[in-house]
């Protein structure tokens, strides 16, 4: 497990983060409904050559969760920009997944953040997105938030399992589910789904173009959440190279094929 011993207060939200390794900076940004623990088998591989920063998005993992909180994509890029400023980063390497990918792109095009390289995979970046489950929860947040614990836990773990191509162990499922359980966590889980809004990617999608850093786009061939075709389209917009298909992998490449991500980041940082 990765340790997140630090807390930063950003726009009234407590954001938990950690840092390991030494060398130039690398920032890892997780997606939904996960936490920075998705990087536990990946970022330790870079500690001999990079100082790796990782954090839990606002409303996720160990970061603060509370009623009435804005945890949408509309705030996450602002949080990333604030963390860059606090950490004193100018052009770090960036590794981003899912909502983390959307956050990295929004921060680049809207907040002016710049990266030494961007490795982005299975990202929420192009419309349409949002599964039928997401659309249903958006319209019935209160009903889902009030479900009995055992029903919520069963639904949550079943949902998490669909992110991976290979069976995820009970231990790993429990790790990912833990922040979303209990009175605070259960409400927070449905809150973040209810706030999923395509307008936050629509407003930046028109700005997509070749970025001023090397961009590597990877995508799980078996991603049931965001189809591979979106990875192909995204690569054409922001990179000078085609998408890299990841075989035997679903949306959660960190669990299915972590070695592919390690290799991609090493290639990106070694080629500069």
What label would you give each PLM region?
Residues 11-19:
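A short loop-to-beta-strand scaffold at the N-terminal edge of the catalytic core in hydrolase folds
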Residues 185-236, 245:
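Conserved serine/cysteine hydrolase catalytic core
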Residues 19-62:
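Conserved HGGG/HGGXW glycine-rich cap/lid loop of the alpha/beta-hydrolase fold
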Residues 129-131, 149-210:
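Conserved alpha/beta-hydrolase catalytic His-Asp/Glu region
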Residues 53-96, 263:
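Active-site loop/oxyanion-hole signature of alpha/beta-hydrolase fold enzymes
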Residues 109, 115-147:
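Flexible "cap/lid" loop of the alpha/beta hydrolase fold
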Residues 96, 100, 104:
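Gly/Ala-rich beta-loop-alpha elbow adjacent to hydrolase catalytic centers
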Residues 241-272:
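Catalytic active-site module of serine/aspartate enzymes centered on a nucleophile-bearing elbow/loop
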């Amino acid at each position: 497990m990765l340790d997140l011993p630090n807390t930063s207060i950003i726009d009234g939200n407590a954001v938990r983060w950690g840092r390991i390794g030494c060398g130039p900076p690398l920032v890892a940004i997780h997606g939904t409904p996960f936490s920075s623990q998705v990087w536990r088998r990946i970022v330790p591989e870079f500690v001999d050559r990079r100082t790796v920063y990782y954090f839990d998005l606002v409303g996720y993992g160990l970061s603060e969760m509370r009623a009435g909180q804005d945890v949408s994509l509309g705030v996450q890029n602002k949080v990333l920009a604030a963390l860059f400023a606090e950490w004193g980063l100018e052009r770090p390497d960036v590794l981003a997944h899912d909502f983390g990918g959307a956050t990295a792109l929004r921060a680049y095009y809207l907040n002016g953040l710049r990266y030494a390289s961007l490795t982005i995979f299975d990202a929420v970046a192009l419309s349409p997105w949002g599964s039928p489950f997401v659309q249903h929860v958006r319209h019935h947040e209160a009903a889902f938030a009030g479900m009995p614990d055992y029903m919520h836990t069963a639904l949550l773990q079943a949902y998490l399992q669909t992110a991976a191509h290979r069976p995820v162990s009970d231990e790993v499922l429990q790790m990912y589910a833990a922040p979303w359980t209990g009175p605070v966590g259960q409400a927070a889980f449905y809150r973040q789904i209810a706030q999923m809004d395509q307008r936050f990617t629509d407003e930046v999608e028109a700005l997509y173009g070749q970025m001023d850093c090397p961009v590597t786009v990877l995508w799980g061939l078996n991603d049931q959440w965001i189809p591979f075709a979106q990875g192909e389209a995204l690569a054409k917009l922001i990179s000078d190279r085609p998408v890299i298909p990841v075989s035997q992998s679903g949306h959660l490449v960190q669990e299915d094929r972590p070695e592919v991500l390690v290799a991609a980041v090493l290639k990106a940082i070694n080629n500069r």
